[in-house]
């Protein structure tokens, strides 16, 4: 079988899409290695806990927790070189970019698949050397940069890397059909294949401690989660909606709240809700599903403020559905793509519209039977359409074609 390298820009434990890809390819018989970057000691510990259990290899090309001075300096110089002089440096795209290239080049794999902005440059360089490369467009990288941030990033250079790789890569994936169509039109090529960011049904049977976040089991519960509790990701709309909700409900937020965001949080949460919002820290991925499942409604309120964000589906949307929650999601092109097929599991609301969000929440709280049916619809849609077992073969077919070409 083939030797395959998968390049990610961060920790293994946070790279759920690359993890599933690597596992599927390894289970088919390929020799798979993921190259990543370590920058956080807590996440290093999570990675090290995972490694004995996975059927592939993992190599951190840079470990910033031990030898961070030079890699951080290179990254800073790359960023400043662009910001001050408008001169492009691949180091400005992420940590360990050149280290990724050096290791992937020396390994001489049959296929190298990249998953981040910085590794786009690596794939382009490998292609120039005659190597076979692939790209998983987890995001449309040049199109997730907000207009006010554009001067800080080499958008044109990233866009040219994307266009080139869409034309030369042997393996091309996106997380939605809408993004696939848009990328195909952008590069004037056949659209990449869509593999949704869905989860395995087997996760429902994984051993995990029973967990509940709820205070009052008889009161319906809303759940929102992210790595950080910060401005954006729909929290402004949620806080604006809370005073307008007419029915009893618990609101649970999961994520880390750092010092700089605490002031924003205190200022924006309605005074009458400050003691009623339940805060939870992040947990290991293995603990997250049972905690989500203890709630009734999941919120996926990411705004489609950029074209890239509009075309994708928040991964948490599929996580909520796997856990059996009804979902209220922002009315983006990506969410529209899947909402109709869920047959009532997802309500779409205009992004950043507190009144619309409050009305959507109340519509389910007012009619508990409707909420129950929506939760059942989420389970049904997950089992029939939006699970890893349904899309795994699409990924393997794409890999087989890439390796046979």
Residue positions per predicted region:
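Membrane-proximal helix-turn-helix segments that form the acceptor-binding/catalytic region
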Residues: 94-106, 121, 125, 135, ...
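Carbohydrate-associated surface elements
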Residues: 178, 198
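Glycosyltransferase donor-sugar binding loop
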Residues: 39-41, 250-265
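A charged, aromatic-enriched C-terminal amphipathic alpha-helix characteristic of glycosyltransferases
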Residues: 352, 366-399
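Nucleotide-sugar-dependent
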Residues: 16, 229-233, 286-291, 298-321, ...
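Conserved donor-binding/catalytic core segment of Leloir-type glycosyltransferases
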Residues: 213-243, 252
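Conserved acidic donor-binding segment of nucleotide-sugar-dependent glycosyltransferases
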Residues: 341, 346-354, 363-369
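Nucleotide-activated donor-binding/catalytic signature segment of Leloir-type glycosyltransferases, i.e.
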Residues: 219, 255, 263-292, 297
């Amino acid at each position: 079988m083939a030797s395959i390298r998968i390049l990610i820009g961060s920790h293994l434990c946070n790279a759920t899409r690359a993890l599933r890809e690597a596992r599927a390819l390894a289970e088919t018989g390929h020799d798979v290695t993921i190259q990543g970057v370590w920058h956080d000691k807590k996440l290093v510990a999570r990675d090290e806990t995972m490694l004995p259990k996975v059927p592939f290899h993992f190599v951190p090309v840079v470990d910033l927790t031990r030898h961070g001075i030079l890699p951080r300096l290179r990254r800073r110089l790359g960023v400043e070189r662009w910001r001050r002089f408008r001169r492009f440096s691949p180091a400005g795209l992420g940590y360990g970019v050149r280290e990724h290239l050096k290791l992937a080049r020396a390994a001489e794999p049959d296929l190298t698949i990249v998953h981040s902005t910085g590794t786009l440059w690596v794939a382009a360089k490998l292609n120039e050397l005659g190597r076979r490369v692939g790209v998983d467009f987890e995001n449309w990288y040049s199109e997730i940069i907000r207009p006010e941030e554009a001067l800080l990033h080499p958008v044109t250079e990233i866009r040219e890397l994307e266009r080139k790789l869409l034309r030369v890569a042997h393996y091309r994936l996106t997380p939605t059909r809408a993004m696939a169509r848009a990328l195909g039109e952008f590069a004037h090529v056949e659209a990449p294949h869509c593999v949704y960011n869905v989860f395995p049904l087997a996760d429902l049977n994984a051993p995990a401690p029973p967990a509940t976040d709820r205070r009052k089991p008889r009161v319906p519960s809303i759940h929102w989660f992210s790595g950080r509790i910060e401005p954006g990701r729909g929290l402004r709309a949620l806080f604006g909606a809370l005073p307008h909700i007419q029915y009893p409900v618990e609101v649970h937020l999961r994520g880390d709240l750092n010092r700089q965001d605490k002031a924003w949080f205190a200022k924006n949460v309605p005074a009458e809700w400050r003691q009623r919002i339940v805060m939870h820290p992040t947990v290991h991925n293995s603990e997250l599903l049972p905690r989500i499942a203890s709630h009734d409604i999941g919120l996926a309120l990411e705004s489609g403020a950029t074209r890239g964000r509009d075309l994708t589906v928040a991964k948490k949307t599929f996580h909520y559905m796997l856990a059996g929650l009804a979902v209220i999601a922002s009315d983006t092109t990506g969410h529209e793509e899947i909402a109709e097929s869920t047959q009532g599991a997802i309500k779409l609301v205009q992004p950043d519209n507190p009144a619309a969000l409050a009305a959507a929440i109340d519509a389910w709280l007012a009619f508990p039977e409707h909420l129950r049916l929506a939760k059942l619809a989420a389970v049904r849609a997950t089992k029939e359409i939006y699970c890893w077992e349904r899309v795994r073969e699409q990924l393997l077919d794409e890999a087989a074609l890439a390796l046979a070409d």
